[in-house]
């Protein structure tokens, strides 16, 4: 069995270089929540050096709060901003002689698009209009995945190793209890359940069906590198191949 392992990079974390030796896909910040032209170039080069698939990580324009502020922007504005960010990274990737593989929204843009079909439609249309061969990454079972399918994009359903889930399969909001999993054993067990059994236990104790095609490791987590190594070892022991 195969699984993609992705990480958000270019967000100012010192561990990016090491993390890129452990994952198969990199979501590179495009300047709206973190990063700039230089960090984008550096991240692209580092990803290419490690044979890691490159993706754009567009966000709401919110550098002050790392893209985690809820915004009520018109879909047309989100469409334009998504195109802008994808295009910026795409130019850098092309200049390095490679191609971009996927797009994964960041933070609150990701969370809102998981539930708001109009926002999801704007993002999916931007990805399709820029390059219909790009993979759209979104929360498993979300509106963003459905919007991507409507635009006939290849979609990749994402699960999170270190996030708590609600009974409907959505993520527990960051400000609520149970949003983040700090215990490494719990995060590892949850990830293996999602990948191997297609299920996740919600914070209320209810088991929910989930499709896991890519697993996110947050590079800004305190133990991200150690956990990534443990997860790779666990996958290897179970004959689960990490591949983009």
Curated annotation (Swiss-Prot):
It holds the Pfam family LamB_YcsF. Keywords: ATP-binding, Hydrolase, Nucleotide-binding. Gene3D superfamilies: Glycoside hydrolase/deacetylase. InterPro entries: Glyco_hydro/deAcase_b/a-brl, LamB/YcsF/PxpA-like. Its EC number is 3.5.2.9. GO terms for biological process: carbohydrate metabolic process. It catalyses: 5-oxo-L-proline + ATP + 2 H2O = L-glutamate + ADP + phosphate + H(+). SUPFAM superfamilies: Glycoside hydrolase/deacetylase (SSF88713). GO terms for molecular function: 5-oxoprolinase (ATP-hydrolyzing) activity; ATP binding. Forms a complex composed of PxpA, PxpB and PxpC. Catalyzes the cleavage of 5-oxoproline to form L-glutamate coupled to the hydrolysis of ATP to ADP and inorganic phosphate. Belongs to the LamB/PxpA family. This is 5-oxoprolinase subunit A. It comes from Salmonella dublin (strain CT_02021853). The lineage of its organism: Bacteria, Pseudomonadati, Pseudomonadota, Gammaproteobacteria, Enterobacterales.
């Amino acid at each position: 069995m195969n699984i993609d392992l992705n990480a958000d990079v270019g967000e100012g974390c010192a561990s990016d270089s090491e993390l890129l030796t452990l994952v198969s896909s990199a979501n590179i910040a495009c300047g709206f929540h973190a990063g700039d032209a230089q960090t984008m170039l550096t991240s692209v080069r580092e990803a290419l050096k490690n044979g890691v698939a490159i993706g754009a990580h567009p966000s709401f324009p919110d550098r002050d709060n790392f893209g985690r502020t809820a915004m009520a922007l018109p879909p047309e504005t989100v469409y334009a901003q998504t195109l802008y960010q994808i295009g910026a990274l795409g130019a850098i990737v092309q200049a390095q002689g490679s191609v971009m593989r996927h797009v994964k929204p960041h933070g609150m843009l990701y969370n809102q698009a998981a539930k708001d079909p109009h926002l999801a439609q704007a993002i999916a249309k931007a990805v399709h209009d820029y390059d219909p061969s790009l993979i759209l990454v979104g929360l498993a079972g979300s509106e963003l995945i459905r919007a991507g399918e409507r635009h006939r994009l290849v979609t990749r359903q994402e699960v999170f190793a270190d996030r708590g889930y609600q009974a409907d399969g959505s993520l527990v909001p960051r400000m609520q209890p149970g949003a983040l999993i700090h215990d490494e054993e719990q995060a590892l067990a949850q990830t293996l359940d999602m990948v191997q059994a297609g299920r996740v236990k919600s914070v209320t104790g209810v088991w929910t069906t989930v499709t896991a095609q890519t697993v996110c490791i947050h590079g800004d987590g305190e133990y991200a590198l150690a956990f990534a190594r443990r997860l790779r070892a666990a996958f290897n022991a179970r004959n689960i191949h990490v591949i983009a």
